């Protein structure tokens, strides 16, 4: 039950972040209105229909579904009544010009065994690489993922101190490509690891090795398929927001 406080809140933009912020503010009792310049919600996570076919626009990989579920739970709703997804395994299949196909399974052991069977790298070397990326995640997640960067107090915690103390272990002084070439002998594995730089429009030859945390997130923590496509994330969150009283105004630049 939302405890009303009669205060008003305006959110600019009905992208996923804007919708999420609106849901959180509504749960704090604010009367929330969202203004969006476009005629549709979602921002980058939108959709387009042509000739009877619908295409998801923008993001194509879904990780950390628990952060979406969190908004429903916060609102006292069952996530599965709004939004469903399934686990992808294998996460990817990679097709190369030489005709070879490499499967990226969700599971550290399976991934390493599968890749070792089809490349010149050993299972042990691949496991070692994934363990290094896991270490990067453990040192950086609490700073960049689990807490707000806009609150000064979040910088004065034991976890942040641990991250700073181990700064040299997160690959910040290496490029992604350099770190990946040191880790793998097979150029296909280097290529697979390097491609994660494209997620934020970066180059693996310029980006810090810290971004090698992304393979860990997808391979070990998992990637998922939202039933109904990626746009179902937007649709479900908009429905939740409306159900708890958030007002939307579209085409209002």
Predicted regions and their residues:
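Helical element adjacent to the flavin cofactor pocket in flavoenzyme catalytic cores
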Residues: 213-253
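Active-site-proximal loop/short-helix segments
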Residues: 206-214
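Generic recognition of stable, solvent-exposed alpha-helical segments in well-folded globular domains
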Residues: 14, 20, 67, 110, ...
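Alpha-helix capping and helix-loop boundary segments enriched in small/acidic/polar residues
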Residues: 56-59, 205, 224-228
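Rossmann-like flavin
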Residues: 97-206
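Active-site substrate-recognition segment that forms the wall
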Residues: 81, 204-205, 240
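N-terminal glycine-rich phosphate/pyrophosphate-binding loop and immediately adjacent elements
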Residues: 2-139
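Generic, well-ordered alpha-helical scaffold segments in large soluble proteins
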Residues: 19, 24, 28, 179-183, ...
């Amino acid at each position: 039950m939302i405890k009303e406080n009669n205060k008003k809140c305006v959110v600019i933009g009905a992208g996923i972040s804007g919708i999420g912020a609106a849901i959180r503010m509504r749960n704090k009792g604010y009367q929330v209105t969202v203004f969006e310049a476009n005629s549709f919600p979602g921002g980058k996570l939108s959709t387009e229909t042509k000739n009877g076919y619908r295409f998801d626009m923008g993001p194509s990989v879904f990780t950390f579904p628990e952060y979406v579920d969190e908004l429903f739970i916060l609102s006292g709703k069952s996530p599965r009544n709004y939004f469903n997804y399934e686990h992808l395994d294998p996460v990817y299949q990679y097709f190369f010009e030489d005709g070879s196909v490499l499967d990226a399974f969700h599971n550290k052991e399976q991934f390493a065994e599968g890749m070792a069977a089809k490349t010149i790298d050993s299972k042990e070397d691949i496991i070692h690489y994934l363990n290094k990326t896991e270490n990067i995640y453990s040192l950086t997640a609490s700073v960049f993922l689990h807490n707000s960067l806009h609150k000064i107090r979040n910088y004065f915690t034991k976890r942040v101190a641990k991250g700073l103390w181990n700064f040299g272990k997160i690959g910040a002084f290496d490029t992604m490509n350099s770190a990946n070439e040191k880790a793998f002998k097979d150029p296909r594995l280097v290529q697979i690891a390097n491609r994660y730089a494209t997620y934020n429009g970066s180059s693996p030859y310029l980006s810090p090795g810290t971004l090698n945390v992304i393979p860990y997130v997808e391979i070990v923590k998992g990637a998922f398929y939202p039933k109904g496509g990626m746009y179902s994330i937007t649709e479900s969150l908009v429905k939740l927001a409306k159900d708890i009283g958030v007002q939307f105004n579209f085409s209002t630049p």
